A protein has these predicted regions:
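Structural preference for solvent-exposed beta-strand-turn elements
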Residues: 1-375
Length: 375
């Protein structure tokens, strides 16, 4: 039973580890790759069949990276010939595996850990680079024992345990905060404080990259809530400079790069990102879509299979930008309007309402000259 949401609160009454029932219809994930991957891990261990579907964008995203290890654990999962959703899952009695991830992905890691809760024996996941550890912190918060994890690249758990109900305080999302951090960083005279933001060290690559570019940024009131570090983030405008981004920071800022590309477009000099091929299989090909949009604004951009080079400029032009239904790209170009000499219109923005309800109102409150255009 789920009660709410009510004033930001949601109450969930659990049914225990063996209490889930077969869904009566396909489960629609909308545009959420995270939801699909996490539920795939959970459903792979259930004694029933289920089907996961999504919107047009999600249905074009490759899911082989979770299907392969889940199949090794014993699940049967069918997709399209292209390896994309819909995903038909026939649950099974799973066995734990040792899995070396070829690409750092918190979603793949989390999917396997959730499947491992029900598996016989130990499920061990090793990541090639440190990535987000929210799932590990959450499971520990629910009383489940894990070994390893951040700052080590290996984490494991033994199946068959139990989860204990707990209260969770969800901090403000740093991926959403990134748009406002960049907005302040590129707007002369801006001073901004964002309160109670999650600053999990596996997520703060955006802060480190902005610092290296010259942003005037500090943390206050640092504390830990529900196993997650939180803080108030202060940022003041300061001239930014182009940098070569350390590839080690890529998994720590993977969802923030659309906003960071806008910062790079407003910086003095050239910013180079490599080792970020993961950006090509997000809600859109974020390397190409961002490059196309920045070029429309007059920015010199070079793309690579695994990254991008952006030559900053003192001002941007105006244009009509196709976000390709990618919420983060839509919000990034909204922020770019702060340095544009004429109007920027962003198309296909409907998914912004899913990931960041109230973005337009909050952006207007922060000082952006922004309005929604009815279809």
């Amino acid at each position: 039973t789920i009660v709410g949401p009510d004033s930001g609160n949601l109450t969930i009454y659990g049914v225990g580890m063996q209490g889930l029932k077969a869904p009566r219809a396909p489960l629609y994930m909308g545009n959420s790759g995270t939801a699909l991957r996490l539920l795939a891990g959970l459903l792979a261990a259930q004694p029933f069949e289920s089907r996961l579907t999504g919107d047009e964008s999600l249905s074009a995203r490759p899911m082989g990276r979770i299907v392969k290890p889940l199949a090794e654990m014993g699940a049967t999962i069918e997709m399209t010939a292209a390896g994309t959703p819909p995903m038909q899952i026939r649950g099974a009695d799973l066995k734990g595996i040792d899995y070396d991830m070829p690409v750092a992905s918190a979603q793949v890691k989390s999917s396997l850990l959730l499947a491992g809760l029900f598996a016989e024996g130990t499920t061990r996941v090793t990541e090639p680079a440190i990535c987000r550890d929210h799932t590990e912190r959450m499971l520990r918060g629910f009383g489940y024992e894990l070994e390893g994890g951040y700052p080590e690249p290996e984490v494991s758990l033994y199946g068959g345990g139990t989860l204990r109900a707990s209260s969770i305080d969800v901090p403000a999302d740093i991926s959403s905060a990134a748009f406002f951090l960049v907005a302040a960083a590129i707007t002369p005279g801006a001073r901004l404080t964002l309160h109670h933001v999650g600053v999990n060290p596996t997520r703060t690559g955006v802060l480190e990259i902005l610092r290296q570019m010259g942003a005037e940024l500090s943390l206050e009131n640092e504390c830990e809530v529900g196993g997650e570090p939180v803080a108030d983030i202060n940022i003041n405008y300061a001239p930014l400079a182009g940098i070569e981004i350390d590839p080690a920071l890529v998994p720590l800022a993977i969802d923030e790069f659309p906003a960071l590309f806008v910062a790079a477009a407003c910086a003095d000099g050239r910013t180079v990102l490599r080792g970020a091929e993961e950006l090509r299989v997000k809600e859109s090909d974020r390397i190409e879509v961002m490059a196309t949009g920045l070029r429309q604004l007059g920015i010199s951009v070079e793309t690579f299979e695994d990254g991008i080079a952006i030559e900053g400029a003192s001002a941007l032009g105006g244009a009509t930008i196709d976000s390709h239904g990618d919420h983060r790209i839509a919000m990034a170009f909204a922020v770019a309007s702060l340095r544009a000499e004429s109007e920027i219109t962003v198309q296909q923005c409907q998914n912004v309402a899913t990931s960041f309800p109230g973005f337009v109102a909050l952006a207007a409150e922060a000082g952006l000259n922004i309005e929604e255009i009815a279809d």
